[in-house]
UniProtKB/Swiss-Prot annotation:
Its main location: membrane. InterPro entries: DUF1232. The keyword Membrane applies. The keyword Disulfide bond does not apply. It comes from Bacillus subtilis (strain 168). The lineage of its organism: Bacteria, Bacillati, Bacillota, Bacilli, Bacillales. The chain crosses the membrane at residues 53-70, 74-93. Keywords: Cell membrane, Membrane, Transmembrane, Transmembrane helix. GO terms for cellular component: plasma membrane. It comes from the Bacteria. This is Uncharacterized membrane protein YkvA.
Length: 106
């Protein structure tokens, strides 16, 4: 049941990302994703869970890969699946990313 709820929340998050007012926040989340991966790789932030790192890596790979569920060349529709994946990943790891952001501010 938790997975189904997470998928539904991810899809809702994906729709929210597509709204113009939420794009800035989405870009901030993506930036945080990359910063967390970089800090973990450099050994600066060793508290990351392996699950979180794998999910972040999978999300980034999915977004940059040319093969998608909905191809990116279809204007207007091509980024819906990318947004849904970002929304799903964010739903699954937002607690740890919040902890990471607090750690960065220290």
């Amino acid at each position: 049941m938790k997975k189904k709820k997470a998928i539904m929340l991810g899809a809702a998050g994906g729709k929210a990302i597509l709204k113009r007012k939420n794009r800035k926040k989405c870009i901030q989340h993506i930036t945080t994703f990359f910063q967390m991966l970089r800090d973990w790789r450099n050994g600066d932030y060793p508290r990351s869970q392996v699950k979180t790192l794998l999910l972040l890596t999978a999300a980034i790979l999915y977004i940059v890969m040319p093969l998608d569920i909905i191809p990116d060349v279809i204007l207007g529709l091509g980024f819906i699946d990318d947004a849904a994946v970002l929304g799903l990943i964010w739903t699954l790891i937002k607690k740890e990313l919040s902890q990471y952001e607090k750690w960065r501010l220290q």
